[in-house]
Amino acid sequence: MAGPEWQSLEQCLEKHLPPDDLSQVKRILYGKQTRNLDLPRKALEAASERNFELKGYAFGAAKEQQRCPQIVRVGLVQNRIPLPTSAPVAEQVSALHKRIEEIAEVAAMCGVNIICFQEAWNMPFAFCTREKLPWTEFAESAEDGLTTRFCQKLAKKHNMVVISPILERDRDHGGVLWNTAVVISNSGLVMGKTRKNHIPRVGDFNESTYYMEGNLGHPVFQTQFGRIAVNICYGRHHPLNWLMYSVNGAEIIFNPSATIGELSESMWPIEARNAAIANHCFTCALNRVGQEHYPNEFTSGDGKKAHHDLGYFYGSSYVAAPDGSRTPGLSRNQDGLLVTELNLNLCQQINDFWTFKMTGRLEMYARELAEAVKPNYSPNIVKEDLVLAPSSG
């Protein structure tokens, strides 16, 4: 596995390939070339001063006679935790709020309409430890917790929709915990929330020690800037998860994540891009950055020696379009903001071209899946009938 000093696949290709070869490789890896956005000088200067990467790209669409372009700019934020995990909880939360506020201000300079933060952005991703304290103290109300109120102010100040993935404390239902994304309108009002539908039980991802599978289904939020959904982290491995957000009308599906190189880096460039193709929508994959060390060693029953960290979070956030094209990714080792301009007309244009929704045969799969989940289901396997086989004599 590449270490944190390896910046990105894009940098490696650009460094070692001749221009003609590079063009062909990018055509295959990234599809139709995206246009570079001309970002404001003051935004670029602010990003440099605040020590984070700022990149901007745009997807086009064919001009139509009956519809105006539906242009929306999304901002994906990837970042490391600014304080050690041993710092007091309140100080860690405050430091993360400050860091995100710095980045959100630059997003506003770039005209971002919808901004999404990484999974459990206001805390370390400490679920590997299986310890309850102090990590459960980061949990907050999705409706009126400290972090939600912070994001409401950001949303109203900058006139942008905010997607805020947090560890939720649901006090209306016994104080149980959920892995939740809060969606806040550009008016500053909480539109609602969605929960992580699939919980990993692999390696050090011991998340089911804290929370279980979400119970809110696949909600899609009708914002001023388009219909959006949030497929949290591990849910990207489940094609039906993406599908149901699309069935409910999502034009943009965000995938805020916290995943490490050893586990998933080779899968990362494929899954969200494939989902964009299969579901005729835009997908936005974002991942945290860096390595987080915990005071106490932990193990996960996988034969590895006790250790103090989960692994290296490799960033590499990107956006994919329904035509299969995608932006270059942000770096593997820097905080960053990826600004991407989308024309939502492309969703219908590609739907009309490839017709996956028309040819998807959902009724057939619904019928067969309804049978497959029954306890007495017998798989439809056709075997050779040896009784009817011709004799060798």
Swiss-Prot record:
Xref: SUPFAM superfamilies: Carbon-nitrogen hydrolase
Top EC class, one word: hydrolase
Subunit description: Homodimer, homotetramer, homooctamer; can also form higher homooligomers.
Entry keyword set: Allosteric enzyme, Cytoplasm, Hydrolase, Metal-binding, Phosphoprotein, Zinc
Pfam families assigned to the protein according to its UniProt record, in alphabetical order: CN_hydrolase (PF00795)
Compartment list: Cytoplasm
Active site per the UniProt annotation: 119 (proton acceptor), 196 (proton donor), 233 (nucleophile)
Protein's recorded name: Beta-ureidopropionase
Biological processes, Gene Ontology terms: beta-alanine biosynthetic process; beta-alanine biosynthetic process via 3-ureidopropionate; beta-alanine metabolic process; CMP catabolic process; dCMP catabolic process; dUMP catabolic process; in utero embryonic development; liver development
EC id: 3.5.1.6
Gene3D superfamilies from the UniProt entry: Carbon-nitrogen hydrolase
Phosphoserine modifications at: 378
